[in-house]
UniProtKB/Swiss-Prot annotation:
Motif (pLxIS motif): 480-483
Family the UniProt entry places it in: Belongs to the rotavirus NSP1 family.
Region named Zinc-binding domain: 42-79
Keywords recorded for this protein, A-Z: Host cytoplasm, Host cytoskeleton, Host-virus interaction, Inhibition of host innate immune response by virus, Inhibition of host IRF3 by virus, Inhibition of host IRF7 by virus, Inhibition of host NF-kappa-B by virus, Inhibition of host RLR pathway by virus, Interferon antiviral system evasion, Metal-binding, Phosphoprotein, RNA-binding, Viral immunoevasion
Protein name: Non-structural protein 1
Region (RNA-binding): 1-81
Region annotated Interaction with host IRF3, chain positions: 317-486
Domain of life: Viruses
GO molecular function, one term: metal ion binding
Post-translational modification: The C-terminal region is phosphorylated by host CKII/CSNK2A1. Phosphorylation of the DSGXS motif is essential for host NF-kappa-B inhibition.
Swiss-Prot/TrEMBL GO biological process terms: symbiont-mediated suppression of host cytoplasmic pattern recognition receptor signaling pathway via inhibition of IRF3 activity; symbiont-mediated suppression of host cytoplasmic pattern recognition receptor signaling pathway via inhibition of IRF7 activity; symbiont-mediated suppression of host NF-kappaB cascade
Length: 486
């Protein structure tokens, strides 16, 4: 069993405060939940196991046992997970408060050691000091944490995480904040605690302490689509799809990093617990991460030969053509916005190709095809600009003075005409590289304006942010019939 989970189970019996705070789903009756093969550490009980997604943020960070309490590190409720979650700049004073909370909830003194020893020795075969029977005493106080960056905010979830070498398929990475504290002082605190333990347990305690207090902070991970619930990815192509999150809330009103101080006043803490309740929010999945995911899927279905074709149909409506017919059975086309972007982008590029290159049929092999395959991946701006520049140069532009120009004298559809008129003021006959980049951007931004999108979905917002957006009716953000811009 995980050391942190064992400690919570045993120390929960000490007093009323501990019984309220140290109650973990991992130590209660098991309830079934959706499991995946994603491996990592449950933030609630700190054990390494198979994880399921959290109902509060939809990220995989909770085990099947702890999921029954629906606790999230972004909650506004003073449960243990929230109280050991710190944000952004963590000061020495903040860490001192955390250590004091640990020492209050998991004390080690002669009275406590004798009490647990007597209980354990009531079993006939437990006269020896074996680690499996005294595992709760072997949790040192460290500044080990799992960290994650969400839209500019860095969160540190402190705890005692065993088996740091094991596989980690979550967006969290290990961070050691001992350098923000006093190393010798933390050593002294742990040596004082260790002194009350039997000699055979002291050695194990020391080994665990030094291994969890002297490690090097890992490089921070980037959160990706695979870190979120599979249910999101399966329904992402429905423009009407919304995400539902459930958050634990209360009338707790303290600075984010001061939540661990609440247990200093026990009566006030229990008053706050009485106000605990859950709130649910329906949230739009719109963000750069999920937009890029959808555009990447569409990119895999691209038939670049269309830009050399003479089809009268739109790019997604060509049938019975070996070189141009796309797979219309793909779920990505259920999002009409993807279809519109695909059709207009390829209508415009075809007009450029036909105006500047001598191509006559979609069966011809052209060098430009390779460059077109990633034209929808606009979320990586620098790479996309280089790609459009490459396409432009393959159109055999004419150089006059310092600028290069390409022709535009082939038919285009009404949507592209409107884009040209709105962006340039007319339908031009010659275009520069900047014009081509600008037009392609506007075609895509008309439906997926990544300039004004957050990187991760609103499921990673704090309760206060969600409440503010909900009051302004901005959590759903749009209906299926209008674009991101509108």
């Amino acid at each position: 069993m995980a050391t942190f989970k064992d400690a919570c189970y045993q120390y929960k019996k000490l007093n009323k405060l501990n019984n309220a705070i140290l109650k973990l789903g991992a130590n209660d009756v098991w309830r079934s939940s959706t499991l995946t093969k994603r491996k990592g550490w449950c933030l609630d009980c700190c054990q390494h196991t198979d994880l399921t997604y959290c109902q509060g943020c939809l990220i995989y960070h909770v085990c099947e046992w702890c999921s029954q309490y629906s606790r999230c590190f972004l909650d506004d409720d003073p449960h243990l997970l929230r109280m050991r979650t710190f944000r952004n700049e963590v000061t020495k004073s903040d860490l001192e408060n955390l250590i004091n909370m640990y020492d209050t909830l998991f004390p080690i003194n002669q009275k406590i050691v004798n009490k647990f020893t007597n209980i354990i020795k009531q079993h006939k075969c437990r006269n020896e000091y074996l680690t499996q029977w005294y595992n709760h005493f072997l949790m040192p106080i460290t500044l080990q944490s799992l960290s994650i960056e969400l839209d500019g905010d860095i969160y540190y979830i402190f705890g005692y995480y065993d088996d740091m070498h094991k596989i980690n398929q979550t967006p969290f990475s290990f961070a050691n904040l001992i350098n923000k504290y006093d190393v010798l002082l933390l050593d002294s605190i742990n040596f004082d605690r260790m002194a009350f333990l039997p000699l055979t347990l002291q050695q194990e305690y020391a080994l665990r302490y030094f291994s969890k207090s002297r490690f090097i902070t890992e490089r921070r991970k980037y959160i990706e689509t695979l870190h979120f619930s599979d249910n999101i990815l399966n329904n992402l192509h429905n423009p009407n799809f919304t995400l539902q999150v459930i958050r634990n809330c209360s009338n707790m009103s303290v600075e984010w990093n001061k939540a661990c101080n609440l247990i200093r006043n026990i009566s006030d803490y229990f008053d706050i617990l009485k106000s605990s309740h859950t709130e649910s929010y329906n949230i739009s999945p719109r963000c750069r991460m999920f937009t890029q995911y959808k555009l990447k899927i569409a990119s895999k279905l691209i038939k670049p030969n269309y830009v050399a074709s003479n089809h009268n149909s739109l790019a997604t409506e060509v049938h019975n053509c070996k070189w141009c017919s796309i797979n219309n059975n793909s779920i990505v086309w259920t999002d009409f916005r993807i279809k519109n972007v695909y059709n207009d982008v390829f209508n415009f590029i075809r007009a450029l190709v036909k105006s500047n290159l001598y191509v006559g049929h979609c069966s011809s092999e052209e060098r430009i095809y390779e460059s077109i395959k990633d034209i929808l991946n606009v979320c990586k701006e620098n790479e996309w600009n280089m790609l459009v520049t490459e396409i432009f140069n393959q159109l055999d532009p004419i150089k006059l003075n310092e600028d290069s120009y390409v022709l535009l004298n082939y038919e285009i559809n009404w949507n592209v005409m409107n884009v040209l008129i709105n962006s340039i003021g007319k339908i031009p006959k010659i275009l520069t590289l900047n014009d081509v980049i600008s037009i392609l951007r506007i075609i895509i931004y008309d439906w997926f304006d990544i300039r004004f999108m957050r990187n991760t979905p609103m499921t990673t917002f704090t309760v206060n942010k969600l409440k503010q957006l909900y009051e302004k009716d901005k959590t759903a953000e749009y209906d299926s019939g209008i674009s991101d811009v509108e």
